[in-house]
């Protein structure tokens, strides 16, 4: 019977509501649904317990995946996740702004209509000149927001060796929250 116990860090609260695990800390809170047949995830005092009655390879790999998700949640609510992006342009100076819950890119390749990307979850976007900094407690929301912004400025139907304009990810967290 495989069983994994994860210690809940200090200054972090974890709660279970049926299939959802909520982790709260200084940087905010993250809720995630963790469900797979024959795998039980529970909060027991100061530990999160992942256990199963099955012992096959698929169940073991899913237990490892759940363990990584919970560790990422702990890291997010204590230290947070941070992505760095840079604005590059050579022909037309583009402006990048935050309007409400959207990132707005104006004058990309001289276009008249602005391009917009949704800011996901509790992601905080800070723009300082030509650098864009994204941070937040949810690894997936921060990473998806960064990816959406990068895809928003993808150059189509032009020679990408000449048209290198865009907003590119230049710094992202490595494996294990490094």
Label the predicted regions.
Residues 1-178:
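Ribosome-associated RNA-binding proteins
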